[in-house]
Amino acid sequence: MKTNLLNYDLQGLTRHFADMGEKPFRAKQVMRWMHQSGAQNFDEMTDLAKSLRHKLNEQAGIEIPKLMMSQKSSDGTRKWLLDVGTGNGVETVFIPESDRGTLCISSQVGCALECTFCSTGRQGFNRNLTAAEIIGQLWWANKAMGVTPKNERVISNVVMMGMGEPMANFDNVVTALSIMLDDHGYGLSRRRVTVSTSGMVPQMDRLRDVMPVALAVSLHASNDEVRNQIVPLNKKYPLKELMAACQRYLVKAPRDFITFEYVMLDGINDKAQHARELIELVTDVPCKFNLIPFNPFPNSGYERSSNENIRVFRDILQQAGFVVTVRKTRGDDIDAACGQLAGQVQDKTRRQQKWQQILIGQQG
């Protein structure tokens, strides 16, 4: 079986070429060809000796996930469904803004966590994505979006906020992050790459030590009682532990704050008392808040908070001195908005089956 070189960051690629008896600079050449030029085969790499290209063709490959579907929203948001084999597909989303282009990348086929308000969580879980399948999403998006009139890449920011919990696929995510940041890869700044987590505390500490990019935490509740219900991981790592981990992360973080993501669920977590509890909860954590109006999906059981409740909630936080943004709903007409990504998941957890039985029972 041929080795997929897309699975390697520069360090891994250098080791691979050393094993082939080649000098380290070959790794940099090949990395630039793959990620900066978008090369899909070794014959395109004209500055490599023919003998090396022949050897690479025999022993290795550049295997990129195949494109299954591409959609474009009325607001310019783009969504791609990529084939990762055995009937599974993952989604990646490009969100254009006036000052940046952000790509939202998936890390797993489905998600092993069961956040109750998330469409991906309802799909169950199949497996972790390889580093090649993660970075392949950025490869595809760069190819599709091209460059600006100034010859700059359209994609300037990456957020690991697609399907899956990135921290649960730690090693492959870190390899992909390394490629994103490498000057021979995509050359992104650590400040422009964000990893989102539901609160896997040990992995947050590991990421701080090996790849401290910007961090977003899917908080969604101001107390353990509510968070236990909607983010079951909280039962393992309750809010006190999570806040302490956030403080530790900031020691090495590229930004001097944590972004707390907070989906606004009508009657669940959107009252004024919840906002005041939040202020108390994050007292010792430099942070900003990103309030996310819930994006409905079929049979979710939740409703989006009213605009008035969101406004009051935001105002309470702002009056306490916090930077607060209310996320614009983007791409919801193609199910590309936050919490709507589902892809195609061959579920190994029977979670899809469980939810179908619950819905049948409710209808009966």
Swiss-Prot record:
Its main location: cytoplasm. Keywords: 4Fe-4S, Cytoplasm, Disulfide bond, Iron, Iron-sulfur, Metal-binding, Methyltransferase, rRNA processing, S-adenosyl-L-methionine, Transferase, tRNA processing. It is an enzyme of class 2 (transferase). InterPro entries: Aldolase_TIM, Methyltransferase_A, RlmN_N, RNA_MTrfase_RlmN, rRNA_lsu_MTrfase_RlmN/Cfr, rSAM. One of its GO terms (cellular component) is cytoplasm. It is found in: Cytoplasm. [4Fe-4S] cluster binds at residues 111, 115, 118. SUPFAM superfamilies: Radical SAM enzymes. GO terms for biological process: rRNA base methylation; tRNA methylation. S-adenosyl-L-methionine binds at residues 164-165, 196, 218-220, 295. Disulfide bonds join 104-338. Its cofactor is [4Fe-4S] cluster. It catalyses: adenosine(2503) in 23S rRNA + 2 reduced [2Fe-2S]-[ferredoxin] + 2 S-adenosyl-L-methionine = 2-methyladenosine(2503) in 23S rRNA + 5'-deoxyadenosine + L-methionine + 2 oxidized [2Fe-2S]-[ferredoxin] + S-adenosyl-L-homocysteine; adenosine(37) in tRNA + 2 reduced [2Fe-2S]-[ferredoxin] + 2 S-adenosyl-L-methionine = 2-methyladenosine(37) in tRNA + 5'-deoxyadenosine + L-methionine + 2 oxidized [2Fe-2S]-[ferredoxin] + S-adenosyl-L-homocysteine. PROSITE patterns: RADICAL_SAM. GO terms for molecular function: 4 iron, 4 sulfur cluster binding; metal ion binding; rRNA (adenine(2503)-C2-)-methyltransferase activity; rRNA binding; tRNA (adenine(37)-C2)-methyltransferase activity; tRNA binding. It comes from the Bacteria. Its EC number is 2.1.1.192. Residues 97-333 form the Radical SAM core domain. CDD domains: Radical_SAM. Binds 1 [4Fe-4S] cluster. The cluster is coordinated with 3 cysteines and an exchangeable S-adenosyl-L-methionine. The active site is at residues 91, 338. Reaction proceeds by a ping-pong mechanism involving intermediate methylation of a conserved cysteine residue. Belongs to the radical SAM superfamily. RlmN family. Specifically methylates position 2 of adenine 2503 in 23S rRNA and position 2 of adenine 37 in tRNAs. m2A2503 modification seems to play a crucial role in the proofreading step occurring at the peptidyl transferase center and thus would serve to optimize ribosomal fidelity. This is Dual-specificity RNA methyltransferase RlmN. It comes from Neisseria meningitidis serogroup B (strain ATCC BAA-335 / MC58).
